[in-house]
Structures are given as C-alpha cells and as structure tokens.
Amino acid sequence: MEYVLEVKNSPRHLLKQFTVCDVPLYDICDYNVSRDRCQELGCCFYEGVCYKKAVPIYIHVFSALIVIIAGAFVITIIYRVIQESRKEKAIPVDVALPQKSSEKAELASSSSKLGLKPASPGPPSAGPSMKSDEDKDDVTGTITEAEETED
C-alpha cells in the first residue's frame, strides 16, 4: 500500500493546544509503529497509520473571526480618536480658559484693596460695558501708584 503525503503547514503555535485526532488527518507521524508507540509520540493511530494531530477547520474559522472582530474594534477606536483630534483642531482657540479658584480669590482681594470691581467670571466681551483704552491705562497707572505708597 502506497501513502501519498499531502503538503500541509503545521498548525500555528497558538493553535497547537487545539489539536485533535479528528478525520481528516494529513501528516503522517511515523510508519510501521504500534498503537502504543504512536500515542507515546503524541500522534493519532487511525486505520493502521500513525498521523500527527491536526487543528480542525472550525477552530481556524473561529480564530479568524476573533482576529477580524478585534481588528475592526481597533480600527473603530483609531477612527474615533482621529475624528476627535480633527474636531479639536476645528474649534477656534479664542475661548478663554477658566481660571482656578485661587486665582479668582487673589484677583478679588487685590481689586478690593484698590477699590476696583471684581472681575466677572465670563469672558471679557460678555461684560455690560467695555472700557476704552484710556480707562485701561488709568487703571494701570492707579495700581502702580498704590503699590508705590505701600512700599
């Protein structure tokens, strides 16, 4: 009796733990050995021939599905991160950052010493009246004079 070997790749290392003695078995483990010797080699004895254990097709399909789903998940996450970064770039940087509570307290205490109104929590353009450039200069000059007299 002549045996024709089919060339098949050995199972991947990750799938080797799923090898079983199910038909069809392709790779011959050893010729002219007993059933006991075949089992010692870790092979399957089927119809008088000692075959290497094989990974069933359904295990290959299942592992391929897992890889495809994991890949789709990773691609989705990457796509969302890219979209978020594009949205952040599209938003103008004109929005003022909120001040910390300690900074607000310092501003309020320094303005109360000088007799100024505390700063409003909103953006500068949200105030009811806008000061002209001359008023801003006057305030700056007043603060400088007050600091000189305290020293």
Swiss-Prot record:
Signal peptide segment: none
GO cellular component: membrane
The entry's keywords: Membrane, Transmembrane, Transmembrane helix
Keyword Metal-binding: no
Extracellular topological domain residue ranges: 1-56
Record membrane topology: Single-pass membrane protein
Segments crossing the lipid bilayer: 57-77
Localization per record: Membrane
Segments in the Cytoplasmic topological domain: 78-151
Extent of Low complexity compositional bias: 107-119
Pfam families in the record: TEX29 (PF15839)
Positions of the UniProt region annotated as Disordered: 100-151
Keyword Transmembrane helix (UniProt): yes
Entry protein name: Testis-expressed protein 29
Species this chain originates from: Homo sapiens (Human)
